[in-house]
Amino acid sequence: MKIERNKSVEQWAIEEIQNNWGNEAREGIHLTDLLTPRRKYWQVVKPLKASIKEISYWTSGSAIEAKILAAMGYAKGETKEWKGIKYSVDTFLGNIPAEIKTRRRALAEEGKEEEIYEHYLKQLLGYCAIENSTKAWLIVLSMLEYKDATHTEPEWAFYDVSFDENELEDERKRLIETKLLLEDALKNKNPDLLPYCPKWMCARTLKIMTKKPYCITCNKEFETEWGANKHISSKTGAGHEIMPAEYEIKVEKICKYYDDCKPVLD
């Protein structure tokens, strides 16, 4: 038997996928657009091909969702419209909106769900506001849940989510206001009044060590600041003079519209 990776066919297939992905572009403004209206603005004004990484994530997530819903005996929610905003809840468990999310990282620790699942919960809040439901289900599949030092395993988590009436009313107002802002921005070709996306969608700020910490006294270089601090805290290194590490700050762009949008990062 002989097996070889065929780079030329691979490249052709990837280009075909990218060229044909999204040809059936969805019309109108969707609820998910109002979670990140500035990104939606740039997608309309300056459409770019989806990366193969984006396509791979989207297709794997949607395939899991479809299979799981079918196995549970539930149908995919139909596309509806409310005040000119289109939306599609993943499904309804009984009459309760339910959203299925797949993660390539661990589940949230207990007590940190609101922080870790913030973006998921904002989407659910929008659905609940429109459907006038104070209850929701958030179903999360972690593909890489830590089990021990040698392996990870997929793990499901089902969360009861509840909102109060004030939260629903505030979200209905926000959806309408954001829709109007987005429509005005597209009409005037100016996104300045649109809120920025969450920073984790824009870029990562990396602190890169360019010069390692160095002990002048004993002419020794250390890989980390921790190592240098450990040295001067020891009997052999007590009183030694340390030249601290030097760093540069690098921005690693995540969003393809980063240069157009120019987000402000801390």
Q: Language-model segments: what does each one mean?
A:
Residues M1-P97, T102-G111, E118, T150, ...:
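Metal-dependent nuclease catalytic cores that hydrolyze phosphodiester bonds in DNA/RNA
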Residues G61, E65, Y120, L124, ...:
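A structural signal for well-ordered alpha-helical scaffolds and beta->alpha junctions
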Residues A66-M72, E115-L144:
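Metal-dependent nuclease catalytic cores in nucleic-acid-processing enzymes
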Residues V89, L125, K253:
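Residue-level detector of short, conserved catalytic/binding motifs and their immediate flanks
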Residues E114, S133-E221, E225-K230, S234-D266:
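Metal-dependent nuclease catalytic regions and adjoining charged, substrate-binding loops involved
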